[in-house]
């Protein structure tokens, strides 16, 4: 049975790691970690959220003897602190592949919830209903996260991430925010009021926008894993894909600037107060032209700063187009830039309804506005319930209704998602992890796994180390591990 262990990358290997062949290019590894909220309605007596989560994970515990496991598609499934089930996608080379893996996580969580619901109904009422929320704030005001992971070349200093990337991450929420109804009005993000630091290595005693804890899950001399905490959980497929795609292009420009010792174009974008800027961006609809103060003393609107990033990336593409194109197997640079340009133009015009088929906050705003027109006496509590239904991946109806009526863009089909549930990406080390986990489960072997280690613990101990996340070809030690199965 599998056991989970944490991987401390710097002590992984007895010999010096072989530098990745991708170190000199623009290829990247993408990943998304999503914490889900759980609740039960319709029960005859209260059901603790922690009990619900444990009931959901009972099949996992029965199979793996743990609430932490890796799946045959290369992903990690585990029960996080408290009652939040979490799914971390397998390593992907393309935002589209990462999107498919993220949607596979929704599928897995939904199935776990519906199985647990049948069990709960035996004890708590035939009407007991489990809700699994892909959002970031619960009704008690507790925040939980959606974290993006990007493999970044280590020669880029953390100070540069804070000063050149963070302003982009804050203002990209104009089109990636999930939106939230609050007693004080509608915000375009979910977590702005909960993030209090720009960068930090802690995530418990503080709530940073970017986590700097050094766990690259790769050669630590070549790469760091950028752990982005600012960002909402998205139902919109377009938003999940878009936030990964545009962030990749900005990171490419930053990396190339440090590689060559040239300006990136983002040197003067740092905010004087990132947390204050984040809160202002979240209230974009209150004042779309609100000015944000930069460290230089200059003031600029969120949209104005996004246009600066867009212009700098466009100029970068003109001289690096071929190299950038080869960095993404399934997404074209033309598509990313076209979508970016169109969304900025729509925001400039105030044409928020034009974004309602792809941007979560715009979709929710359209729904709330229509509801208030039909029912002027609608209460905040009723709108809050509608919002929760939008985020409920287990028993919610609203988002599914939007997609079935083509009011929300879908980039992947149901077959694409079903494939991602059972299969890892074929061009990263996730392919090897998935192959090992699938084989070990099929024969009932005792094994352990993490992002960089695969270990057979009985009847004989064998181990394979997968330090290069880009490498999908079996190593001799991996082949020996598989033969031992």
UniProtKB/Swiss-Prot annotation:
ATP binds at residues 76, 89, 451. The keyword Metal-binding applies. It catalyses: ATP + [prokaryotic ubiquitin-like protein]-L-glutamate + [protein]-L-lysine = ADP + phosphate + N(6)-([prokaryotic ubiquitin-like protein]-gamma-L-glutamyl)-[protein]-L-lysine. The active site is at residue 80. Its EC number is 6.3.1.19. It comes from the Bacteria. The keyword ATP-binding applies. Keywords: ATP-binding, Ligase, Magnesium, Metal-binding, Nucleotide-binding, Ubl conjugation pathway. Mg(2+) binds at residues 33, 78, 86. Pathway: Protein degradation; proteasomal Pup-dependent pathway; Protein modification; protein pupylation. One of its GO terms (biological process) is proteasomal protein catabolic process. InterPro entries: Pup_ligase (IPR022279), Pup_ligase/deamidase (IPR004347). One of its GO terms (molecular function) is magnesium ion binding. NCBIfam families: pupylate_PafA (TIGR03686). Catalyzes the covalent attachment of the prokaryotic ubiquitin-like protein modifier Pup to the proteasomal substrate proteins, thereby targeting them for proteasomal degradation. This tagging system is termed pupylation. The ligation reaction involves the side-chain carboxylate of the C-terminal glutamate of Pup and the side-chain amino group of a substrate lysine. Belongs to the Pup ligase/Pup deamidase family. Pup-conjugating enzyme subfamily. The reaction mechanism probably proceeds via the activation of Pup by phosphorylation of its C-terminal glutamate, which is then subject to nucleophilic attack by the substrate lysine, resulting in an isopeptide bond and the release of phosphate as a good leaving group. This is Pup--protein ligase. It comes from Bifidobacterium longum subsp. infantis (strain ATCC 15697 / DSM 20088 / JCM 1222 / NCTC 11817 / S12).
